[in-house]
């Protein structure tokens, strides 16, 4: 029995890694923006992989507001909640409360059911770039425990037509690209202090491509563009993920036509 268990895990697990070593879109970060984008991209027929450094998904949703088990979503994001069949409760002034555990579960299930592949415990170490002027063409990654141990282990590659940084406050992928491929012309300015009403709108408006092949969604957008933070209101994250999917889909279609 033990041998069968081991061989089943090795065979099918390595088959998944092989299959998703080349994708249309590599999303880094399985938080609200990343999972939302993954679902809408997969629904449009794109091969999507989501890498999450933790062994769980949801990003900042789980702790709710200061560990109180509720988050807030505004009216504009209700259509996204409906797409994922997430229940919500009105509180007035166009605001609604949502259960964090339900939102995490349904965002992840929605992305998976649409065809996206989520791989947990992955630390993205670097990007692949091509051309002059350069464009981002994929990722280098190792398992998170390897990165945490400080061991020098060469990473593996994932080739992607588009890379979406949905890593949150630190914009980890874009930070790496800006430092190691300065020719991309990307700068991470860092987010500002809180102004929720303004930031919820700006994060959606500024979502999109930051360099050829490289995109930002969610709090990574705030980090790149120096926008205010917003706290435990998540409508902007959901809308940013949806907008990122729309922009990436459009770019991939246009790129395929040009190619």
From Swiss-Prot:
Belongs to the THI4 family. It catalyses: hydrogen sulfide + glycine + NAD(+) = ADP-5-ethyl-4-methylthiazole-2-carboxylate + nicotinamide + 3 H2O + H(+). Pathway: Cofactor biosynthesis; thiamine diphosphate biosynthesis. PANTHER family: THIAMINE THIAZOLE SYNTHASE. It comes from the Archaea. GO terms for biological process: thiamine biosynthetic process; thiamine diphosphate biosynthetic process; thiazole biosynthetic process. Involved in the biosynthesis of the thiazole moiety of thiamine. Catalyzes the conversion of NAD and glycine to adenosine diphosphate 5-(2-hydroxyethyl)-4-methylthiazole-2-carboxylate (ADT), an adenylated thiazole intermediate, using free sulfide as a source of sulfur. Its cofactor is Fe(2+). Glycine binds at residue 229. One of its GO terms (molecular function) is pentosyltransferase activity. The keyword NAD applies. The lineage of its organism: Archaea, Thermoproteota, Thermoprotei, Thermoproteales, Thermoproteaceae. Its EC number is 2.4.2.59. Transmembrane segments: none annotated. Pfam families: Thi4 (PF01946). This is Thiamine thiazole synthase. Homooctamer; tetramer of dimers. Keywords: Iron, Metal-binding, NAD, Thiamine biosynthesis, Transferase. Fe cation binds at residues 154, 169. It comes from Pyrobaculum neutrophilum (strain DSM 2338 / JCM 9278 / NBRC 100436 / V24Sta). NAD(+) binds at residues 33, 52-53, 60, 124, 152-154, 219.
């Amino acid at each position: 029995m033990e041998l069968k268990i081991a061989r089943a895990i090795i065979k099918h697990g390595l088959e998944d890694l092989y299959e998703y070593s080349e994708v249309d879109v590599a999303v880094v970060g399985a938080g609200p923006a990343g999972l939302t984008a993954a679902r809408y991209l997969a629904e449009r027929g794109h091969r999507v992989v989501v890498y999450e450094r933790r062994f769980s998904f949801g990003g900042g949703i789980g702790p709710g507001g200061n560990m109180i088990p509720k988050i807030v979503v505004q009216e504009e994001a209700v259509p996204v909640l409906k797409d994922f069949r997430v229940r919500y409760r009105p509180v007035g002034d166009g605001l609604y409360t949502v259960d964090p555990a339900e939102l995490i579960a349904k965002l992840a299930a929605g992305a998976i059911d649409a065809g996206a592949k989520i791989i947990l415990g992955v630390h993205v170490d670097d990007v692949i770039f091509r051309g002059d002027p350069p464009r981002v063409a994929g990722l280098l990654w190792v398992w998170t425990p390897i990165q945490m141990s400080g061991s020098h282990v060469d990473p593996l590659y994932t080739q992607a037509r588009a890379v979406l940084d949905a890593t949150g406050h630190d914009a980890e992928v874009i930070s790496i690209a800006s430092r190691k491929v300065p020719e991309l012309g990307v700068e991470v300015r860092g987010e500002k202090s809180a102004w929720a009403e303004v930031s919820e709108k700006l994060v959606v408006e500024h979502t999109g491509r930051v360099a050829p092949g490289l995109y930002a969604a969610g709090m990574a957008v705030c980090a790149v563009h120096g926008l205010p933070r917003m706290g435990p209101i998540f409508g902007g994250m959901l809308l940013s993920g949806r907008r990122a999917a729309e922009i990436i889909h459009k770019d991939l279609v246009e790129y395929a036509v040009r190619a």
